[in-house]
Amino acid sequence: MDTFLLNICVFLDPTRKDKCREFIFETIDITQFIVNSNLFLFIALIFLLILIKIFFLKEYENYSSLLLAFFLFILFVLIMVNFRTNIPWVDDWEWIENLQVQKISTVEWLLQPANIHNIFFIKIIFLINNNFFNLNFELFNYLSIILIFLISIIFVKNEKIDNSIYAALFIILIFSGKQFANFSQASNIAWTICFFYIISFKYTVSSNKVSSIILCSILIFISPLTFGLGYVLPLYVLTFIYFQEINYKIKINYMILSIAGILLAQMLPRIFFDDLGISGSNTNYLNILFHYSFYLTFFGVLSNVFLPWIEGVAYVGTIIGFIQFLLIFYLILKNYNQQSFFGIHIFIKNNTLIILGLIFAFIVSLTRPDLQTIVAARYSVGSIIFQIGFWLYLYKENQYRYLINVNFIKLVIIYILTSGLFFPYHGIHWQAKRHLSNNKVLECYKNDTKTVTNRCNKLAYNTLFYGGKWYEIELFNEQIRVLKDKNKSFLNF
């Protein structure tokens, strides 16, 4: 059996042949740990209830979507409680650095971008956590799951899906377990918050109500000041707001706010804080646009949510995404032949999520055109947005109702559910592995004396940065010292 699994591993990712044996033994150990964990029976019971609910779901059931969302919310919370993580990982340390070492003022820190991202509003959340909750990183885990639950509520409330089986597909997509890599790393809450922005925007942008206009205006303005994914909203407005049937003054307002948000996100740090080391990018995006890797990534990342986190299946993702894109193009072309330009107008107006998903894929393919982008869990949010839009479009195309085959849709639902929860480095496997690493570091510090502090720091540094050396070890040690002295965050003991 081990040889069979090893051969599969090598076939799927030949570049990591040396790691396959280690991965297989590690996965077996983690599986045994999961089965023997405290809340495993409760988790298994909830999962079984969800599976039974899907198997015996009828086409027309009242409140089935809300019930499914509630069960998934409980399942995700149980997984988080059973496999707790409360330590900063990788980018988190850079994002919280100034809260400990205080090299610059708080205002400068808020305006200082991280890599290519302006994360002003995410840093405000970090600051609140630091000042009122002792920098408790576990809060981010549960906040992410709450946001996902709220997204599902917003979706169910606004989309009147009369087919319960099809409605379940959208709920399962929203609750994809591939997002656990985002849930359990504090900085990745930016992806979930932007997901919340995008779904809220989708159901307010076409409204002329004052409350909707205010909310939509806020979302458009703050989204590029939150994270890179947030740029999809102002870019959508600047490109496609014409097609929305709202007052032209509202359209102009949205366009002004889009430009203002982008300019503030890009220019404010450079204008007022040019000493922060922010430099312009030397990337030649035109060359990338004409390179095959752009198109591999563009189509591949659209299907990210379906894929295991293995580079060897990235090309499969590209094929899936390309087929979906072709199907959309075919339906648009058919509607154009029947309705001329009006058919395209209707498509753009009614399929905001597809457009937003394509904008996401375009941005990611320009900035990170590689196979890892296609399969990496962090990009699953953009894929989920596109897939929700894609399946909504198929559902609403009346002449293609034959595509809503009950058994086929149930198979898709079960695949997304099980792959998201049980594939390696997804769902339960991801969270359990993080939990074990988390506890290994914590136990070292709990048993720590002044004579072994350096040993624990080295262990933590190698573990929390996956063996990478990009973050200065001296800054890491200084942060640990401050956290220990103040009994703060995960060193609060």
Please place each PLM-identified region on the residue numbering.
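Intrinsically disordered, polar/acidic, low-complexity terminal segments
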Residues: 7-53, 64-117, 126, 130-167, ...
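Membrane-interface alpha helices of multi-pass inner-membrane proteins
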Residues: 212-240
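Transmembrane alpha-helices and membrane-interface helical segments
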Residues: 50, 153-157, 199-207, 233-244, ...
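Membrane-interface micro-motifs in multi-pass membrane enzymes
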Residues: 29-46, 91, 119, 162-206, ...
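Short hydrophobic alpha-helices at membrane interfaces in multi-pass membrane enzymes
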Residues: 200-223, 250-256
